[in-house]
UniProtKB/Swiss-Prot annotation:
Name under which the protein is recorded: AAA ATPase forming ring-shaped complexes
One record GO biological process: proteasomal protein catabolic process
Organism: Bifidobacterium longum (strain NCC 2705)
PROSITE patterns in the record: AAA (PS00674)
Protein family according to the UniProt entry: Belongs to the AAA ATPase family.
Keyword terms of this UniProt record: ATP-binding, Coiled coil, Nucleotide-binding
Pfam family, one: Prot_ATP_ID_OB_C
InterPro entries membership: AAA+_ATPase, AAA_ATPase_domain, ATPase_AAA_core, ATPase_AAA_CS, NA-bd_OB-fold, P-loop_NTPase, Prot_ATP_ID_OB_2nd, Prot_ATP_ID_OB_N
Amino acid sequence: MSDTEDLAALNDRLMAKNHALAEALSRAGKELTKAKSQLAQLAQPPLTFATMVKVDSTRTDEDGIQHASAEVISGTRRMVVPVASNVNAARLTAGATVMLNEKLVLVEQRDADTVGQIRSVKQVLDDGRLIVTDASGNPVLIRRSGALAYAGINQGDRIIVDPSVRLAIEALPAEGDKDLVLEETPDVTFADIGGLDSEIGRIRDAVQLPFQHRALFERYDLKPPKGVLLYGPPGNGKTMIAKAVANALCEGGYDTNGDGSISPAETHVKGVFLSVKGPELLNKYVGESERLIRLIFQRARERAADGNPVVVFIDEMDSLLRTRGSGVSSDVETTIVPQFLSELDGVESLDNVMVIGASNRVDMIDPAVLRPGRLDVKIRVGRPKTNQAIAIVDHYLTDDLPLEDGVDAHALSAVLVHDIYGTSERRHLCDVQEENGQWHALFLADVVSGAMLKNIVDRAKTRAVKESIETGLDVALTVPLLAAAVEDEYRETRDSMADVDPEQWSRINGMDPIRRIRTAE
């Protein structure tokens, strides 16, 4: 190989190396630039979050450069800071989140924070400011953010406030209170209730007549009752009656004259049923229970403003309105009862609003609640007698069920009830000693309730279903099957009597005070 060829080959190798070195140098330059960028990012000082309050000042110089300052709150510090020239001061809104650099210059605006402390609105002032309270009832005066400047905010609404509790950032729906008050139309009708014809007649007279015959009530200058109390032992239909009343009102009717003709106004009456979860109104924070009671009646007045009847149903009323000074609770009732009474017959009228309460312990309700003019009508829903029990069982034992050949449902109901109401030793639960020291026998019939009757029928049906599964055939409901269900209920009730507190048990079940219980062997 000649020298020329050697030189050419060397030149090619050097050019290849030079090209490789150039590429390596280019890659190194890019990596160096990337590293510098990363170092610059790591060396960038942190930005501080703050809440925008208002623009403090703004002007534009002869060169068109903006010079502005803004009032912000960072943590608990209230400051006036300069605004960067590239941030449009005219677009800064109260309540928005802004960013401050290390020199406390406002360099960026972001959307308002969607999380924060929640407060309840106690009062809306004429200038739009709000008095809000925390869970302990401590009041604070705050301003609205730009997003809430023209929002309709009412007493009792919930809002999110900024960390300094100076600005209302966002309004929230009052979902917590809606959980306590259920606005519904129950599916229970009076036809679904057996054995309570007298009680149903009384409550229909008290609740339905005033709303469906308003012209007659006005003609006789008769005002409808403000409230109805359903009381008596548990499981006998108090809540079902209230639901049936609500169903009847919600279905609506026409305001009629005395002769049954529709009044000239042809007013269509359609009611609203507000079901209040009584025990859930109790709150450990002072004033919170009273606020919830005010909200309940406020909602009732709003629904009744158009002339439609509103029923406020309070179940377990004794848990909410206990006798003041009784010493059987934490004395929270000393403020709850007056608040309830002031809503019931205070300055603001309760036209078209009726309160229906249900309780197993009427002896624990404050007497001021029970006096005439408040809960005017008091209806005792007691334990069913024999004929009433048969009417109740007839609702659950019907002819469309698989029955024993040659026996109709009503006959089975009668056999079942007579077995339950027997006073032989086989239905003897226990012996009880009254306060006068006398002992007497207690039978299953003495503690029977509508709920127990339904439970016995359900036991028999469950037995029939299980036997049908085993045999593959429809097993009929027979007298022996019903008798076995009664026996099961009797044994469970008898066994439970050994563990009850005699005094409390007798009061809850509407009996005379009992000192001791001696169970049957």
